[in-house]
Amino acid sequence: MTSEERTKRSYERRPYPTTNIAGLVDKGGSLPLLKWMQAVGRPGRSAPQRVLVAGCGTGVEAFVMRRRLPAAEIVAVDFSPRSIAWAQRLERAADGVRPITFRVGDLTDRKIADVVGGDFDLITCHGVLSYLPKPSVVLENLAACLRSGGALYLGVNGEAHPATRLRPWLASFGLAVDELREERRLRELLGLWDALNDDGSGELATMSSSYLGGDVCGPHFNNWSLARWRSEANRVGWEVAGTDVLPMALQLAAERKNDRVLYPAGVGELAARLDQARPAGFHRIMLRRAPAGALAVTRAGEGTRPLHWTGLYSVRFSQSAERRTVKAVFNCAAFHVRFEHELTAGQQLVLRALMAAGVAPDGWTKQWNRTAEGRRLLWLWAGLGVVAVGDAAGAGVRG
């Protein structure tokens, strides 16, 4: 039996999650903010009309997306018939909401689009590709389901995922880590692990059997750096448009002007380099259909790829009479990022115009390209999620 077949068997035996589903939905599941997914994944576009939840399990993410987008058509798919049956039971209990279409289907199947349909504005795939041997196959299949200008949210394990160290440690006690077998012995060892580790992963010893069977004792794990995930995505025509930790990581570097050695890396390369220095345990990534490096802010403006205001930040302006400059204080409550920059009067005017219009007109970048410092500032804003590079001219504007 292949690792892929064992993974399927594991989730068919123990659908996940099966407890406190209503509470998980109330908390938004594990999905990032829709506003962020839209701002960096689909800049300048209206709310998604069709959403695919790829690898939906028992339906938590699908129910979350319906709550966020009550008018959208939502399709959810999973390879486990038991998981889909569980989700359908919960769906039948819902009242007064637009129905979700639940399907049984294998994301590794080249014909998955025949099962779920196409023309999706947004696809979410959370906690799925970390457990499949060939994630690039799924990434390629999902691209076939996407509408022009659509985006893919990907939630996957990082290099610092607790299981990276935990599994070899459990194996050193003679415990089988490719399948959940000795659950009592496993929980005893996890109790010791919990006592010695405070890595933010919670009390593993108290986790459900379905969680342990997938995230601790499973047949296959891709606990990869962001650079490796990006490489997998680049191979099949995706580029990283942002990650949920990039703004905070980049701001930490910028506070001491250590970000300068990274200039002029595009958002994808920038996020990968910072993750190498400060590995994440889990990646929340927005992907767009674009060649590697195509979303770099250095390629934006002047009739090529438009630059968009993301709306993730509030900005407060104050005049500095002595220096003849304007101080702009940026604040993003969602990511707890705050910083300030000194702008020229001309830069302040064009920034205000961008904030009002939402998209930069032709010639907008000239105020920044006049100096090396201006170019670096615009690049920094792209990494921090203040602005986002749009689709190439002629790429289509549906949705």
Predicted regions and their residues:
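Conserved alpha-helix/loop element of class I SAM-dependent methyltransferases that forms part
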Residues: 13, 23-47
